[in-house]
Regions:
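A structural signal for well-ordered alpha-helices, especially hydrophobic packing surfaces
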Residues: 21-24, 52, 142-146
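Charged, amphipathic alpha-helical oligomerization/scaffolding segments
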Residues: 12, 16-19, 103, 114, ...
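N-terminal helix-turn-helix DNA-binding core of bacterial DNA-binding proteins
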Residues: 27-67
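Charged, amphipathic alpha-helical coiled-coil/dimerization segments
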Residues: 76-132
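C-terminal regulatory/oligomerization modules of transcriptional regulators
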Residues: 1-5, 128-153
Length: 153
């Protein structure tokens, strides 16, 4: 049973998460505009950068929830802009891996340096134990959100 306090706490958390998401989106859109990209292209770059294993167009499609045609257009834009390169797997030439180009990674790191500094400044006010709880929460909410699908209309 949900209490008024629980609902207020959830609302406060939702507002804070939306505000953080809005600030990150503002930076993402700025970077996209500066680079002549779409915001989705920047999401693709982040997915390629954060992947635990080499990213393929198919995995990128699943991650972004786009059609294969939309992913092809996105990858084409990123390659033309010099952000990524396609590399054929040596064992199976049909498999294509997407790699972030080093110079483009430097440009992104430079652009997003204020975000990194802000995160570091925010972290400085917390103990390691507190940060561990925050990291656990963020991992849990990301996992829950990944399982959410848009309702069918």
């Amino acid at each position: 049973v949900s209490t008024a306090d629980d609902r207020a706490d959830l609302r406060t958390l939702a507002v804070l998460l939306r505000r953080m998401n809005g600030e990150i989106n503002r930076l993402v859109h700025g970077f996209a505009g500066d680079q002549g990209l779409h915001a989705t292209d920047v999401q693709a770059l982040a997915a390629i950068l954060d992947a635990d294993e080499p990213m393929t167009p198919g995995r990128l499609r699943e991650h972004l929830g786009l059609t294969s045609g939309a992913v092809t257009a996105c990858v084409d834009r990123l390659e033309r802009a010099g952000h990524i390169r396609r590399v054929r797997e040596s064992a199976d030439r049909r498999v294509v891996h997407l790699h972030y180009v080093a110079d483009a990674r430097v440009a992104a790191r430079t652009y997003f340096r204020p975000l990194a500094r802000a995160a570091q400044a925010a972290r400085a006010g917390f103990t390691d134990d507190e940060l561990a709880v925050v990291e656990r929460f963020l991992a849990a909410i990301n996992e829950e959100l990944a399982a959410v699908r848009a309702p069918e209309v």
